[in-house]
């Protein structure tokens, strides 16, 4: 057998290990079922928090959020109180594409989150969903004009999904077909060393249609299966297309489950006296009153309004800070949903979760000024609860058009022709395995 020295990666955003097993047992995915007998198929874990931008940044860098610098879809500037969407230019670690490029490998990447703005690679980089104009989202730049002319679409319009589910489903199908068309087009152009395509449409499908599938509700239960039949056809075509010298890696970045309630943590902080606003409703983070003790960013990231760190901080580092963190954690764990179930499974100290060493080896001596993007507390919800971070909502619990939400567990990993250590159990540990495949760079 020919030695495999090239790698094809297909990422299905948010596709659960358990879902693939169910669909295979139902006969929906015969190509994938055949494929798993030829390789290794197992559960994969995400990172905390299990968000696409955070998890794929970890995949690309082999680092935890505290190391690569992305801890959510939204970050804060503690000096100005501005909130902003972090992009690839804020990564603190060199991404896999650049490492491979510097070693002379030819690389291709399409639609992977946290690759916008595009950066120079030895090959082609097509940015993902933070990019609004494909003509400005590629390296080299002329690729963007080519994609635009071919009708390539970066992402489906989520606002359409809030108004018209049928129209949104049709959009998902259209975007998928354009993505796959371009994937096969570019793959045929040359012999790539590393070729990766990311499909965001599976994540979008789950957010809007999970209820219909899990409860077998017409008409979208069958459409959900229809979508995965098409995914299976794509997997089958990829398998047949790959030459003998190319290994195959399929994966997702997090799992999914039925969404019970959206939970608005800043509302909870207001109701419990920890968060005050200059005006109601608040229009921006700058409306957070200096007397506030804490605020939250999505999902479940809680920041103490700390003196010397936040612009208008009023909580002293030391005993006052430690006491407040402990009080918030204890109260959050008592929060119950309208159905009587506990919302919060765990509340972690940020430095513990991300491995930041405490001074003198004790949490009592942790310097919160060193945390950077790391939240003081990270609330981990029980499955089915989505901890929102908007400044204000008219109720603590809500149910909307979204019917699926992320999980830390139940992502999936399939690999054939590449060795992956059994110890590589989370998405951030795969980078090292890929680099080993390419000679231990």
Regions of interest found by a model, annotated:
Residues 2, 169-195, 205-249, 321-336, ...:
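A long, amphipathic alpha-helix that forms part
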Residues 2-6, 14-148, 294-297, 301-310, ...:
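Active-site nucleophile/metal-coordination loop of metallo-enzymes that catalyze phosphate/sulfate
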Residues 2-3, 12, 21, 73-103, ...:
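Secreted, luminal/periplasmic, and some membrane-associated catalytic domains
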Residues 4-21, 35, 59, 100, ...:
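Beta-strand elements within well-structured catalytic alpha/beta cores of enzymes
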Residues 24-27, 124-126, 211-216, 262-271, ...:
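Short secondary-structure boundary/capping segments
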Residues 68, 124-152, 216-221, 267-284:
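Acidic, His- and aromatic-enriched active-site or binding-groove loops in soluble protein domains
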Residues 114, 178-187, 361, 374, ...:
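Amphipathic alpha-helical blocks
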Residues 380-430:
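Low-complexity, glycine/alanine/valine/leucine- and proline-rich hydrophobic stretches
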């Amino acid at each position: 057998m020919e030695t495999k020295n090239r790698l094809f990666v297909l990422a299905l955003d948010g596709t659960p290990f358990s879902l693939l097993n169910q669909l295979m047992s139902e006969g929906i995915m015969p190509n994938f079922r055949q494929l798993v007998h030829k390789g290794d198929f197992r559960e994969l874990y995400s990172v905390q928090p299990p968000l696409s931008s955070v998890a794929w940044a970890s995949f690309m860098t082999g680092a935890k959020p505290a190391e690569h610098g992305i801890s959510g879809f939204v970050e804060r500037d503690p000096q100005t109180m501005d909130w902003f969407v972090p992009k690839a230019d804020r990564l603190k670690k060199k991404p896999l594409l650049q490492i491979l490029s510097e070693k002379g490998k030819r690389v291709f990447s399409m639609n992977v989150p946290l690759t916008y703005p595009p950066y120079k690679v030895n090959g082609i980089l097509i940015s993902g969903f933070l990019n609004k104009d494909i003509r400005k989202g590629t390296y080299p730049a002329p690729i963007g004009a080519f994609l635009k002319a071919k009708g390539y679409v970066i992402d489906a319009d989520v606002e359409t999904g809030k108004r018209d589910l049928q129209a949104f489903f049709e959009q998902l199908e259209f975007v998928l077909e354009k993505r796959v068309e371009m994937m096969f087009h570019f793959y045929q152009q040359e012999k790539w060393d590393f070729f990766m395509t990311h499909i965001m449409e599976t994540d979008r499908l789950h957010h809007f249609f999970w209820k219909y599938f899990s409860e077998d509700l017409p008409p979208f239960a069958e459409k959900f299966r229809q979508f995965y039949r098409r995914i299976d056809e794509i997997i089958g075509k990829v398998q047949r297309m790959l030459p003998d010298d190319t290994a195959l890696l399929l994966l997702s970045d997090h799992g999914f489950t039925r969404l019970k309630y959206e939970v608005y943590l800043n509302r909870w902080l207001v109701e419990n006296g920890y968060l005050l606003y200059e005006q109601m409703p608040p229009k921006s983070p700058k409306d957070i009153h200096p007397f506030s003790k804490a605020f939250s960013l999505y999902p479940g990231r809680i920041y103490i309004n700390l003196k010397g760190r936040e612009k208008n901080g009023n909580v002293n580092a030391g005993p006052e800070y430690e006491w407040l963190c402990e009080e918030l954690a204890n109260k959050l764990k008592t929060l119950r949903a309208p159905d009587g179930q506990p919302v919060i499974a765990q509340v972690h100290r940020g430095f513990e979760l991300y491995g930041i060493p405490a001074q003198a080896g004790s949490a009592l001596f942790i310097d919160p000024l060193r945390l950077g993007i790391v939240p003081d507390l990270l609330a981990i919800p029980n499955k089915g609860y989505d901890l929102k971070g908007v400044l204000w909502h008219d109720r603590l619990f809500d149910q909307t058009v979204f019917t699926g939400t992320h999980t830390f567990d139940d992502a999936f990993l399939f690999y054939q022709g590449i060795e992956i250590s059994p110890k590589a159990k989370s998405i951030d540990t795969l980078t090292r395995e890929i680099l080993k495949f390419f000679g231990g760079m």
